[in-house]
């Protein structure tokens, strides 16, 4: 597991109040991990803070799974 993947999963577990072991790449925030719309907004904000990036609304709407979040962080993180 990459450092980015581990950091993303830790943030998701903390934000959604689930065990880190439940946060697997294929899980969807709403359907599988019980997130609501406010949770997803807070999750995006936490990812922005952690990786020093800004996630536009149109991109945030597409981040619906753990893997989406990992891929986005990998692609957009600041060096």
UniProtKB/Swiss-Prot annotation:
<comment type="similarity">
    <text>Belongs to the acyl carrier protein (ACP) family.</text>
</comment>
<dbReference type="InterPro" id="IPR003231">
    <property type="entry name" value="ACP"/>
</dbReference>
<dbReference type="GO" id="GO:0009245">
    <property type="term" value="P:lipid A biosynthetic process"/>
</dbReference>
<keyword id="KW-0963">Cytoplasm</keyword>
<dbReference type="InterPro" id="IPR036736">
    <property type="entry name" value="ACP-like_sf"/>
</dbReference>
<dbReference type="InterPro" id="IPR020806">
    <property type="entry name" value="PKS_PP-bd"/>
</dbReference>
<feature type="modified residue" description="O-(pantetheine 4'-phosphoryl)serine">
    <location>
        <position position="37"/>
    </location>
</feature>
<keyword id="KW-0597">Phosphoprotein</keyword>
<protein>
    <recommendedName>
        <fullName>Acyl carrier protein</fullName>
    </recommendedName>
</protein>
<dbReference type="GO" id="GO:0005829">
    <property type="term" value="C:cytosol"/>
</dbReference>
<dbReference type="Pfam" id="PF00550">
    <property type="entry name" value="PP-binding"/>
</dbReference>
<keyword id="KW-0275">Fatty acid biosynthesis</keyword>
<dbReference type="InterPro" id="IPR006162">
    <property type="entry name" value="Ppantetheine_attach_site"/>
</dbReference>
<feature type="domain" description="Carrier">
    <location>
        <begin position="2"/>
        <end position="77"/>
    </location>
</feature>
<keyword id="KW-0444">Lipid biosynthesis</keyword>
<comment type="pathway">
    <text>Lipid metabolism; fatty acid biosynthesis.</text>
</comment>
<keyword id="KW-0276">Fatty acid metabolism</keyword>
<keyword id="KW-0443">Lipid metabolism</keyword>
<keyword id="KW-0596">Phosphopantetheine</keyword>
<dbReference type="GO" id="GO:0000036">
    <property type="term" value="F:acyl carrier activity"/>
</dbReference>
<dbReference type="InterPro" id="IPR009081">
    <property type="entry name" value="PP-bd_ACP"/>
</dbReference>
<dbReference type="GO" id="GO:0016020">
    <property type="term" value="C:membrane"/>
</dbReference>
<dbReference type="GO" id="GO:0031177">
    <property type="term" value="F:phosphopantetheine binding"/>
</dbReference>
<comment type="function">
    <text>Carrier of the growing fatty acid chain in fatty acid biosynthesis.</text>
</comment>
<dbReference type="GO" id="GO:0000035">
    <property type="term" value="F:acyl binding"/>
</dbReference>
């Amino acid at each position: 597991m990459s450092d980015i993947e581990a950091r993303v999963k830790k943030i998701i577990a903390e934000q959604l109040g689930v065990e880190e072991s439940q946060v697997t790449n294929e899980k969807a925030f709403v359907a599988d991990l019980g997130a609501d719309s406010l949770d997803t907004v807070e999750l995006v904000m936490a990812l922005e803070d952690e990786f020093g990036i800004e996630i536009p609304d149109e991109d945030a709407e597409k981040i619906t799974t753990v893997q989406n979040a990992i891929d986005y962080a990998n692609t957009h993180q600041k060096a």
